[in-house]
Amino acid sequence: MRDQFISLALMLCILHSACGLYFHISETERKCFIEEVPDETTVIVNYKVELYDPRSNGFMPSSPGIGMHVEVRDSDDKIVLSRVYSSQGRISFTSHTPGEHVICMYSNSTAWFSGAQLRVHLDIQVGEHAIDYANVAQKEKLTELQLRIRQLLDQVEQITKEQNYQRYREERFRHTSESTNSRVLWWSLAQTVVLVCMGFWQMRHLKSFFEAKKLV
């Protein structure tokens, strides 16, 4: 029981983490990120693009003509989302298959501005982190206690999805291991059969050779 409580606490800590970062790209460069997402889980991506200004030697808000093309592919390599957004935006999608989702971003600017340096601030929120609870409380007129219970229920639901996803990964890994072991077994049997046939053929060949030379 104590181990289960510790595991639950660790998973809650993991779920409370968020992916916030920034990276530099040129206007013709493509950057992709992999996010493991359970099925039927909401993912929200917040981003902001800044353009390098050589006069101030810093990054400034990008011009209106520069936007970001965002493409999301699921674990089956199917396109979930693909469209052009402005230089700052909020993207939301829901996963329908569990597994690795690839989020790719690149500038939609033309070659006239190629070579310019961009800084992209990126924040990826998965599951209950993607829910705006302040907005939920205002719409549904929830008290602080009711809102906290709602958050806990969403966290439990997300933990259940994570556990189901881990079972799915374990099942896939077991299937891959069993398939590999089966192929190794059949390959070993095939090698054994080939070696036996080669030995039999060599014995027949040597016997025919000795008989032809009248040594036997």
UniProtKB/Swiss-Prot annotation:
Membrane topology, from the record: Single-pass type I membrane protein
Annotated Pfam families: EMP24_GP25L
Keyword Transmembrane assigned: yes
Stretches that traverse the bilayer: 183-203
Lumenal-facing ranges: 21-182
Function noted in UniProt: Eca and bai are essential, though not redundant, for dorsoventral patterning of the embryo. Specifically required during early embryogenesis for the activity of maternal tkv, while the zygotic tkv is not affected. Involved in Golgi organization.
BP term (GO), one: dorsal/ventral pattern formation
Superkingdom, natural source: Eukaryota
Gene behind the chain: eca
GO cellular component: a single term: endoplasmic reticulum membrane
Signal peptide segment: 1-20
Predominant location category: endoplasmic reticulum
UniProt organism field: Drosophila erecta
Family: Belongs to the EMP24/GP25L family.
Compartments, as annotated in UniProt: Endoplasmic reticulum membrane
Keyword Isomerase: no
Coiled coil: 134-164
Domain GOLD: 30-126
Keywords carried by this UniProt record: Coiled coil, Developmental protein, Endoplasmic reticulum, Membrane, Signal, Transmembrane, Transmembrane helix
Motif (Prevents secretion from ER): 213-216
Cytoplasmic side: 204-216
Protein name (database record): Transmembrane emp24 domain-containing protein eca
